[in-house]
Amino acid sequence: MTELKMCTVCASNQNRSMEAHKVLKEAGFDVESYGTGSAVRLPGPAYDKPNIYAFGTPYDDIYNELSAQDERLYTANGLLTMLDRNRKIKTAPERWVEHKNVFDVVFTCEERCFEAVCDDLMDRGEKLQRPVHVINVDIRDNHEDSVIGAQGILKLARSLADSKDLDAQIMGIMDSWQEQHPKLPLMHAVGYF
């Protein structure tokens, strides 16, 4: 198995990227996670009243604030369970554009995040001349789909790590994976750090 440094990315670094982060970490992968949004947005007491936090706000703080605000509501909609999972993985949501790390594979969870990562890589320039495979696995932003999507990402990550020549084999690996996961559309691009 190849030692690949991986990353998972969604908009707020809360649901999809964190479920995939958890699953990959538990499987022994070297993984980090980020969000591409301008802020962390979570459902609020009404559709037009989301809870908005700055990236870097500790998951513990968000958990405690929402629990004090309306524990019954945020338990029923799964937010407190999600935040409890997240705080066991890392301290706080992190923003993609603020990191300085280098990855072999970046998994994004929706097309706009894929585009944001690809744009950011181009803006950074190719200083290290180090390729990175950016793979979008389109996952709807709800608990059930994040669990299904994370398992799909894990299977794809294992196939990528098992390859003898990732650059030469990646298209075949993704084609085979896509046949097995037709409800999780894939996109792929090569960027550079």
Curated annotation (Swiss-Prot):
Subcellular location: Nucleus
Annotated GO CC locations: chromatin; mRNA cleavage and polyadenylation specificity factor complex
GO molecular function, one term: protein tyrosine phosphatase activity
Any one Gene Ontology BP term: transcription elongation by RNA polymerase II
Keyword line: Hydrolase, mRNA processing, Nucleus, Protein phosphatase
Reaction it catalyzes: O-phospho-L-seryl-[protein] + H2O = L-seryl-[protein] + phosphate; O-phospho-L-threonyl-[protein] + H2O = L-threonyl-[protein] + phosphate
Purpose of the protein: Component of the cleavage and polyadenylation factor (CPF) complex, which plays a key role in polyadenylation-dependent pre-mRNA 3'-end formation and cooperates with cleavage factors including the CFIA complex and NAB4/CFIB. SSU72 is required for 3'-end formation of snoRNAs.
Family, similarity comment: Belongs to the SSU72 phosphatase family.
Subunit structure: Component of the cleavage and polyadenylation factor (CPF) complex.
Listed name of the protein: RNA polymerase II subunit A C-terminal domain phosphatase SSU72
Organism for this UniProt entry: Yarrowia lipolytica (strain CLIB 122 / E 150) (Yeast)
Lineage: Eukaryota, Fungi, Dikarya, Ascomycota, Saccharomycotina
